[in-house]
């Protein structure tokens, strides 16, 4: 049996965020009433995949039991991966991470490769903080690829991968089932889960936030109430699907920012059944229930929070994943675009589609920007002038857009690649230089 990644999946999904799921590709493959029977059905092996400590509080504990044809331990020893090593996982000062400038930074899109390049080969680290070895912080990668992975499988031991496609669909076959993901959707692949990526549209480009720390979860809603923002039912987890395929395959592992490879004589996507709450999932950003002001002022961007990774300090997150989707603006006598801002947190932004309402030009789909701790940022001169003169007695719909932000509590440090690449816009600062002085002490 082989998983067919040449066409869209036909199986449905399991609905809900971090639910206790149970799914089997063969009837009766899940053991009844126990996790590790003396003999599992169909001659399968029982294997637990733990995403948190055994003793983590029940509400935060993540693990799944897999029933597979061969255990994950069956492969040859790892050796260094011979391909390009453009990944960084430790963001202390080094040759890969030079001193971080306080400048506002912006990049054009990562160009499509000129040679055949798959998802793994197309990864490059732009920025990050903390350390994968310390299981703290994150790495922000871009990917640009034009070839499906061929008999190659990948996993990251460093963190969970929040994937934001910008161009091209991704058919992602994982150990626990298949996710078909398109632009305007996101996928999250847990730490350690093995997968392969097919590119049905040829070229593919996007963003990844690799979370080294506490697992992503839905935010509390506070006074919003019991509904709103990203609703749990809209998160989709794959049903069990497996392949029983033998041959010469390659398993690529990411550990402490380095890529390693091992020969493996079978497809590792051989999980026939599984149950638990540690599994990949996807979410359609177009289903986000946007909250906003219906009186005056522009609320803080925390109202656009989709997922976050928490810290031990209440209200202070290690990572916030925020989106700026289509929405109505109705606030009267209010400057409606995002305001001028300096932030104790650091903000890495990307654009999936359209235009961002705080930047008239220069910030394009596939591009990125970085505004670090206390770096002044906000609307450009043209946006400010137009918004200051607009008629706010009438609602206005911000349409044809999907921007997002990875916001972190600690400094986001750009890599040497990010600071030296030709995609860096050296003239980004000029978008604010045309802002005129309006101050007149004689006229209020």
UniProtKB/Swiss-Prot annotation:
Protein family: Belongs to the homogentisate dioxygenase family.
Job description of the protein: Involved in the catabolism of homogentisate (2,5-dihydroxyphenylacetate or 2,5-OH-PhAc), a central intermediate in the degradation of phenylalanine and tyrosine. Catalyzes the oxidative ring cleavage of the aromatic ring of homogentisate to yield maleylacetoacetate.
Name of the gene: hmgA
Positions bound to homogentisate: 356, 377
Protein name in the entry: Homogentisate 1,2-dioxygenase
Key words, A-Z: Dioxygenase, Iron, Metal-binding, Oxidoreductase, Phenylalanine catabolism, Tyrosine catabolism
Active site, UniProt feature: 298
Its EC number(s): 1.13.11.5
Catalytic activity: homogentisate + O2 = 4-maleylacetoacetate + H(+)
Positions annotated to bind Fe cation: 341, 347, 377
Entry GO terms, CC: cytoplasm
Short name of one Pfam family: HgmA_C
Gene3D superfamilies linked: Jelly Rolls
Assembly mode: Hexamer; dimer of trimers.
Disulfide bond annotation, renumbered to this chain: none
GO biological process, one term: tyrosine catabolic process
GO molecular function, a single term: homogentisate 1,2-dioxygenase activity
Enzyme class per UniProt: oxidoreductase
Keyword GTP-binding in record: no
Origin superkingdom: Bacteria
Pathway the protein acts in: Amino-acid degradation; L-phenylalanine degradation; acetoacetate and fumarate from L-phenylalanine: step 4/6
Cofactor(s) essential for the protein: Fe cation
